[in-house]
Amino acid sequence: MKRFLSLILVLSLALSLIALPAMAEGEAFTITVNLHGLDKSGGTANKIGPKHAEETTGIKINYYELDSASAGEKINIMLASGDLPDAFLSIINETQVVSNLPLFVPLNEYLNEENAPNLMKMFEKYPELVDMITQVDGNIYTLPIGDFSNPDNQGEGIQFINKAWLDKLGLEMPTTTEEFYEVCKAIKEGDPNGNGEADEIPVTFTQNNWAAHFINLLGPYGICEWEGGGDGYLKVEDGKAIFTATLPEFRAGLEYWHRMAAEGLLDVEGFTQTNEQFYARLKSYSVASYRGWTPASNFAAEQAAEFTALPALQASDYPEIQSVTPGEINRFCGNCYGFAITRACKDPAALVRWFDAQNADAATKMLWKYGEEGKLWKQDENGKIWALWPEQTEDFTRENMKYTYGAMNHIPCLILPEELEENGDDAPVEATVRLGFVNAVKDHFPAERIPIRNVPAEKIQERNMLYTDLKAYLDSFVADCVVNGLDDAKWEKHLKDVEGYRASEWVQWYQDYIDKKF
């Protein structure tokens, strides 16, 4: 690590003799950023973090906002056309960067004590970061953002259930898929929301919210997503990559959810509904169970308190299979592809300095994450950060506050473990409820996961080429089976069809990745 940092320093000193392209006075950089669905600020530029950054650095930024639902497609068009912003912040992914490295600026020469003292200090304290952001050609094209680690982030989407409705109907908390079926039937017929209408939706989901994908409803059958790819169609056991979509338990899971759908217990519109429609369903107070970050994201305090984590259900027809839910203990929670400067930028050194300045201290980072001090956070005389919990309403929840005042993990800084905010003794119950939900299911996180490391661009392209059509087919097959059912003939045809989509080659790619063959 020290030798690597020394190399960066030597290279930067040598290149400092070369004149950098200069920007005209008063010219602004353009950064493409993520626009979160819970943000009610009216625009990134209205927030204290960006304002403070401009005041302290003198560097003006124009923020070009994309909503997460359409960002991927729009960024692909930008990359293909060459019509690029100066940088991307928290909105570009590994594939988009690695497959287009010539469009991005190698940052090595700008990472030195003079230009980026805060980043250099961070790399010295956490040398593993350098390995994580260094591509196979030896260059650093992206800088890490978000929370380095966070106990709340060990879990991903959690399955929630309205415990108050169970109590009202005299129902026990289900522990198996068959018990869950019976509970959902009772909810469908029992009018637990008390409006006199049969409008209850026992289970909903959406494919347009990272926390609420259908595939994770197959958790009782040992199948769930994992960060880094696969969408639940791949898992790892004893170091071996396994294709899940041809397993007998995969079929059993689809048959179970078709039964639920056929009886009106599963909201099949989840396969097509938007994130906004999903949130509207939740706010209608008709949903009994769904996947999400925390009920406080979707409800005012009184209704949010009715929900609790649904225990990881055991498949009644596969009792030997360990139920799983997405998550990983002590994982790195940051985004290694968080900040990427493009070749369109006339002065990369200035943008690196701007980014570095946002990593100066915990308070500066909190301005970006949570907004101005005194609303969602405060700093004591010892420099420690404490979370604040202002009163929320149904229309402006704490989650709205987070994305309206700040931007959470979509920020130009990496919050280190020692900088994370803590809750005081006077914090409300909801302050620790997310961690409680994670703790309730953490024993069911997959035992093995795909390791995260950088690979050559051509291997990323190979993986994507193999997976694009396969994923489209599998997503369609899953939706069709849940909505219309699955018989032996359909399953046998599926087993043949997946080979036509080169499923075995896709799985072998991951096996070679695990075995470090490239």
Sequence positions of predicted segments:
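Extracytoplasmic/secretory soluble proteins
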Residues: 4, 9, 13, 17, ...
